[in-house]
Amino acid sequence: MHTKVYVSEDRTKVFVLFYEAACVFSNFYPSGFEAKPVENFLKDTEKKEKLLKFTCSEQYFMYNKALLVGDMDIAEQILKETNPMKMKLLGRKLSMTKEQLKLWSQKSKDVMYRACLEKFSQNEDCRMILFRTHGMKLVEASPTDKIWGIGLDKADQRCEDERNWRGSNWLGEVLDQVREELWTRQEFKSNREQILKESLETRCQILEHFSH
């Protein structure tokens, strides 16, 4: 089970706990999309307007991190890479000044939002799963990440109470924001109407058993 759904007894709180790469909410999940680089990160005006192909949201995220640093060699390596973990490791190899680290910490959440927005707007299967979390709270149950995740494994009962979380859950927050943005778009009205016909039990079951 790549996703675990926790529903409180009074049904006022529903957490969708995820982490593994095989889960649609993971940045490693294979989901091709096209997007432009972040405008302010790229000096080449011609490339700014060019749509690039990405295989997953991790690739877009790390590619733009390399652009911010100005390391075009690593940026191109990330674009050519097909393994999400290797994309992440290439991003970690970047040599960043204190100023660049500070800027990236300020901009990274916005870059992740753009990556996820393109991923879910351009992939209907992924979007339908995301829409099934409407009214729920997405939670990256990474036991090791206290910024993008909550610092707890999804099997840990402490996940059921936000007061026990050991991380900020940035990725979960971004995904919640992306879902709400796409949910209101007229072009996805039929998707929305289909989800609204499903019971909470049906949605939870699909979320916990969805496979690529």
Swiss-Prot record:
Domain of life: Eukaryota
Entry annotated with the keyword Transmembrane helix: no
InterPro entries linked: NADAR, YbiA-like_sf
TM spans (from-to): none
One of the Pfam families matching this protein, by short name: NADAR
Position of the signal peptide: none
Swiss-Prot/TrEMBL induction comment: Exposure to P.aeruginosa upregulates expression, in proportion to bacterial strain virulence and dependent on zip-2, but independent of several immunity-related pathways including pmk-1 p38MAPK, dbl-1 TGF-beta, kgb-1 JNK and bar-1/beta-catenin pathways. Cadmium weakly induces expression in a pmk-1-dependent manner. Induced by translational inhibitors such as cycloheximide and exogenous or P.aeruginosa-derived ToxA, in a zip-2 dependent manner.
SUPFAM superfamilies according to UniProt: YbiA-like
Tissue-specificity statement: Expressed in the intestine.
Keywords: Immunity, Innate immunity
GO biological process: antibacterial innate immune response; defense response to Gram-negative bacterium; innate immune response
CDD domains per the UniProt record, alphabetical: NADAR (cd15457)
Function per UniProt: Plays a role in innate immunity by conferring resistance to virulent strains of the Gram-negative bacterium P.aeruginosa via the zip-2 pathway. Can act independently of several immunity-related pathways including pmk-1 p38MAPK, dbl-1 TGF-beta, kgb-1 JNK and bar-1/beta-catenin pathways.
NCBIfam families for this protein: ribofla_fusion
Protein name: Protein irg-1
Organism this protein belongs to: Caenorhabditis elegans
Gene label: irg-1
